[in-house]
Swiss-Prot record:
A GO BP annotation: RNA splicing
GO MF, one annotated term: RNA binding
Claim: Cytoplasm is one of the keywords in the record: yes
GO cellular component: catalytic step 2 spliceosome; cytosol; methylosome; nucleoplasm; nucleus; P granule; precatalytic spliceosome; small nuclear ribonucleoprotein complex
Species assigned in the record: Homo sapiens
Name this protein carries in UniProt: Small nuclear ribonucleoprotein G
InterPro entries for this protein: Lsm7/SmG-like, LSM_dom_sf, Sm, Sm_dom_euk/arc, Sm_G
The protein's assembly and partners: Core component of the spliceosomal U1, U2, U4 and U5 small nuclear ribonucleoproteins (snRNPs), the building blocks of the spliceosome. Most spliceosomal snRNPs contain a common set of Sm proteins, SNRPB, SNRPD1, SNRPD2, SNRPD3, SNRPE, SNRPF and SNRPG that assemble in a heptameric protein ring on the Sm site of the small nuclear RNA to form the core snRNP. Component of the U1 snRNP. The U1 snRNP is composed of the U1 snRNA and the 7 core Sm proteins SNRPB, SNRPD1, SNRPD2, SNRPD3, SNRPE, SNRPF and SNRPG, and at least three U1 snRNP-specific proteins SNRNP70/U1-70K, SNRPA/U1-A and SNRPC/U1-C.
Amino acid sequence: MSKAHPPELKKFMDKKLSLKLNGGRHVQGILRGFDPFMNLVIDECVEMATSGQQNNIGMVVIRGNSIIMLEALERV
């Protein structure tokens, strides 16, 4: 069994990201931290509701297994 390697996310630190999550959820915010399981700490997080409404939800931890897609919104 191979050993898990930490995700290559250092280049995304302190950058604004767009995250697509399971359940059709979409959030944007600034990456402040991560761990080997790809759990992310996102600051200034904004939930983009399907109605077009934006909800500011502050600093959150997003569990790695709920992330479908991650996109940088700033040059890395």
